[in-house]
A protein has these predicted regions:
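Structural signature of hydrophobic alpha-helical transmembrane segments
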Residues: 6-20, 73-87, 150-163
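Juxtamembrane transmembrane-helix termini in multi-pass membrane transport proteins
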Residues: 6-47
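C-terminal ends of transmembrane helices
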Residues: 23-37, 91-105, 167-178
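Hydrophobic core segments of alpha-helical transmembrane domains in multi-pass membrane transport
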Residues: 23-27, 45-51, 84-93, 118-125, ...
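Cytoplasmic-side transmembrane-helix entry/capping segments in multi-pass membrane proteins
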Residues: 37-47, 78-83, 105-116, 182-188
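Ordered, amphipathic secondary-structure segments that act as subunit-interaction surfaces
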Residues: 61-109
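Interfacial loop-to-transmembrane junctions
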Residues: 172-190
């Protein structure tokens, strides 16, 4: 249980997909103009992560790993193709659900909802998971089972959600601020993201 909590907390604060690895920046910047859309996309990304990582974990350990299916056969070279296929299938499911139950959110997110399929935060989490499987059990980043994969996925998703909602809230306030003309738009947004990333650096020394 301690290891699950450690994975969860680390993936939110220490190994945050946005502020530590700058993954998923395209949709992060594009959809963070208001809090409502940011929450919707953040929840969608979290759901996709929680579903895809355990599936990709099983693929990695039961199919792709060396000697997993046949002795002497290593199918790890297929990981990119299979991981992307799983992610694309889950994103298609999420898109249909959002369109069915929240047409206004579906219209607001536009092209960025299906683009979750190529969101590098989703693929990055699967590749980090693949790497962490090989670590020793004493390593706090070790992923050694479905529960670990779910904990890491949920933490990564919540970390991404917090990052995009935080930026959206700030950008809503900045809309009424007297921002210098040369910095309006993406200029002040990049500065804000940089300051937020620096704030999250205070968690980098945590050993949990």
């Amino acid at each position: 249980m301690e290891h699950l909590i450690s994975l969860f907390v680390r993936s939110i604060f220490v190994d945050n997909m946005i502020f530590a690895f700058f993954l998923g920046m395209c949709s992060y910047l594009a959809v963070s103009k208001n809090v409502k859309n940011a929450v919707g996309l953040g929840i969608a990304v979290t759901f996709v992560l929680v579903v895809t990582l355990p599936v990709n974990y099983l693929l990695q350990t039961k199919v792709l790993a060396a000697n997993a299916i046949i002795e002497g056969v290593d199918l790890s070279f297929l990981s990119f193709i299979l991981f992307i296929a799983v992610i694309a299938a889950i994103v298609q499911l999420v898109e249909m659900i959002v369109e069915r139950f929240s047409p206004s959110l579906y219209a607001s997110l536009g092209i960025f909802l299906p683009l979750i399929a190529v969101n590098c935060a989703i693929m990055g989490a699967s590749l980090f998971m693949q790497q962490r499987i090989t670590l020793g059990e004493s390593d706090p980043k070790f992923i050694g089972g479905i529960a670990d994969a779910v904990s890491y996925a949920l933490g990564s998703g919540i970390g991404w959600l917090l990052a995009i909602v935080g930026l959206a809230a700030i950008r809503e306030k900045m809309a009424y601020s007297d921002v210098p003309a040369p910095l309006k738009g993406l200029g002040i947004t990049f500065i804000t993201v940089g300051l937020m990333a620096m704030a999250f650096m205070c968690f980098s020394g945590l050993n949990i």
